[in-house]
Amino acid sequence: MALRLLRLVPASASARGLAAGAQRVGRIHTSVHCKLRYGLLASILGDKTTKKLHEYSRVITVDGNICSGKNKLARDIAEQLGMKHYPEAGIQYSSSTTGDGRPLDIEFSGSCSLEKFYDNPKSNDGNSYRLQSWLYASRLLQYSDALEHLLSTGQGVVLERSIYSDFVFLEAMYNQGFIRKQCVDHYNEIKRLTLPEYLPPHAVIYIDVPVSEIQSRIQKKGDPHEMKVTSAYLQDIEDAYKKTFLPKMSEICEVLVYSSWEAEDSTKVVEDIEYLNYNKGPWLKQDDRTFHNLRMLVQDKREVLNYTTVPVYLPEITIGAHQGSRIYDSFRELPGRKYAPGYNADVGDKWIWLK
């Protein structure tokens, strides 16, 4: 599954949307634009990450259960601190940040469906783990985009969930009998290979909303698929957050926990963020050399996804060679997808031979 995403993503998937939605705020960051592709020569000529970092050059993630209010709080934090907001990565994250930005057919987007998961989480066609595997790869791409933006411009980023909290859904799926143990083993192997390559958030904000209130919000929202989510599944997500995620993250970054009504006061949350010491975690040990290595990784999206390709047979995410080749060839026939970004005349790219 990740191999399919690897083949369908250009090397610089974040280039198209790098500065989208970013704000220019005085004394907050050097620039919201990354004009040239970073490399060894740029580093030698003085493009050093440490020169761009300041007190607001942070990675902040907002976590919580379904319908816990993550989006609004994350947007408010980003706006008040002059950071860039990254909405939660979904199935179409890769297509939204590459090509013309339009959603692609399900065949090019993991062959999975969130609606189908809600309707029939125990479907025997493997949709549940295919969905989880694809979403992890999407979060990985987004996290690499966020780090690329921060290291290239100095502007802080605020994300809704991340690769560090994604596992809470896997644990809930397994506890509810939606996926097999082999799927859990495969997922954990991918985590083992990918997480060490990245730096964790500087701060995690968790919105603690009781399952009963979550269910009430879901019913009020009125999504016919989401309304089928059980309280047991939501409780397993909450348990994974509180028993595993928060204790682990508290060892390597700052953690703030708010109730649903406390999270509504974003000004108070921002004040708490500004009072944090940020005196633990691997960010303290970084220098221009380690930042250079990380920048080289996160700007190469094929390399980012390469870490997720584990050579193991798993029916839920395995497709045949002929089917894979057909999908790849069909993808390359789409507008703006045949060559690297900026080299496709069919979508209006100019001066191709001079690039």
Curated annotation (Swiss-Prot):
<feature type="transit peptide" description="Mitochondrion">
    <location>
        <begin position="1"/>
        <end position="35"/>
    </location>
</feature>
<comment type="similarity">
    <text>Belongs to the complex I NDUFA10 subunit family.</text>
</comment>
<keyword id="KW-0274">FAD</keyword>
<feature type="modified residue" description="N6-succinyllysine">
    <location>
        <position position="285"/>
    </location>
</feature>
<dbReference type="Pfam" id="PF01712">
    <property type="entry name" value="dNK"/>
</dbReference>
<feature type="modified residue" description="N6-succinyllysine; alternate">
    <location>
        <position position="122"/>
    </location>
</feature>
<keyword id="KW-0679">Respiratory chain</keyword>
<keyword id="KW-0809">Transit peptide</keyword>
<dbReference type="GO" id="GO:0008137">
    <property type="term" value="F:NADH dehydrogenase (ubiquinone) activity"/>
</dbReference>
<keyword id="KW-0249">Electron transport</keyword>
<keyword id="KW-0285">Flavoprotein</keyword>
<dbReference type="GO" id="GO:0045271">
    <property type="term" value="C:respiratory chain complex I"/>
</dbReference>
<dbReference type="InterPro" id="IPR015828">
    <property type="entry name" value="NDUFA10"/>
</dbReference>
<keyword id="KW-0496">Mitochondrion</keyword>
<dbReference type="GO" id="GO:0005759">
    <property type="term" value="C:mitochondrial matrix"/>
</dbReference>
<keyword id="KW-0007">Acetylation</keyword>
<dbReference type="GO" id="GO:0006120">
    <property type="term" value="P:mitochondrial electron transport, NADH to ubiquinone"/>
</dbReference>
<dbReference type="GO" id="GO:0009410">
    <property type="term" value="P:response to xenobiotic stimulus"/>
</dbReference>
<comment type="function">
    <text>Accessory subunit of the mitochondrial membrane respiratory chain NADH dehydrogenase (Complex I), that is believed not to be involved in catalysis. Complex I functions in the transfer of electrons from NADH to the respiratory chain. The immediate electron acceptor for the enzyme is believed to be ubiquinone.</text>
</comment>
<feature type="modified residue" description="Phosphoserine; by PINK1">
    <location>
        <position position="250"/>
    </location>
</feature>
<comment type="subunit">
    <text>Complex I is composed of 45 different subunits. This a component of the hydrophobic protein fraction.</text>
</comment>
<dbReference type="GO" id="GO:0005737">
    <property type="term" value="C:cytoplasm"/>
</dbReference>
<dbReference type="InterPro" id="IPR027417">
    <property type="entry name" value="P-loop_NTPase"/>
</dbReference>
<keyword id="KW-0813">Transport</keyword>
<dbReference type="InterPro" id="IPR031314">
    <property type="entry name" value="DNK_dom"/>
</dbReference>
<dbReference type="GO" id="GO:0005743">
    <property type="term" value="C:mitochondrial inner membrane"/>
</dbReference>
<protein>
    <recommendedName>
        <fullName>NADH dehydrogenase [ubiquinone] 1 alpha subcomplex subunit 10, mitochondrial</fullName>
    </recommendedName>
</protein>
<dbReference type="InterPro" id="IPR050566">
    <property type="entry name" value="Deoxyribonucleoside_kinase"/>
</dbReference>
<keyword id="KW-0597">Phosphoprotein</keyword>
<feature type="modified residue" description="N6-acetyllysine; alternate">
    <location>
        <position position="122"/>
    </location>
</feature>
